[in-house]
Amino acid sequence: MGFHHVAITTRDPEATHRFYTEVMGFELVRVEAAPAAEGGWARHLFYDTGNGECLAVWDIHDNPAVPDRFETSISRGLGLPSWTNHLAFAARDLEELTATRDRWRACGFDVLQIDHGWCTSIYLDDPNGIAVECCCTTRAFGPEDAAAAEELRRAAAPPLLDAMVPEVYPALSLASS
């Protein structure tokens, strides 16, 4: 079973739209606006991420059950580090991952990159403070991986990996010479 869509909420629909269309390269494919059960109304925007899956964004208006300044970052709202709750999108191969990293930098973002040994990931935050990852699997999982994963899942004190230090790729200058 795959994902149909994952939904997030925004307080800045224009910045969010620019981010997911220009930076991420997704296409806005559907918008629904409807009254909310508690009052007010909401707009639900669907961005095609590829393979028939979507990222949905809620834009909430005049809802008495929703505070004016609500926290859009799930992690920050729970008092957790930003990397805990995040969106991870798949790159087909390392060339696509590199092209995505270069596009993010050209859009003015510093990009973190980590080689996890079985995948390589790049990271940035969206305008809502949600961590966004693009990940390329570099090694297939085998039966030994599943067995080791189950053992580590059950371990009271699993062995820890060495700290992963990301490579930082700074944003490219947006100023023209």
Residue ranges, per PLM feature:
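Vicinal oxygen chelate
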Residues: 2-11, 46-50, 68-177, ...
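Core segments of cupin and vicinal oxygen chelate
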Residues: 9-60
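Short Gly/Pro-enriched turn/cap motifs at secondary-structure boundaries
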Residues: 35-36, 78, 112-113
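Short, flexible, glycine-rich and Lys/Arg-enriched loop motifs at helix boundaries
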Residues: 37-41, 72-73, 144-147
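A broadly used, surface-exposed interaction patch
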Residues: 57, 65-70
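Histidine- and/or cysteine-centered catalytic micro-motif in compact active-site loops
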Residues: 60-62, 92
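Short, surface-exposed beta-strand-loop junctions and turns on beta-sheet-rich folds
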Residues: 63-64, 138
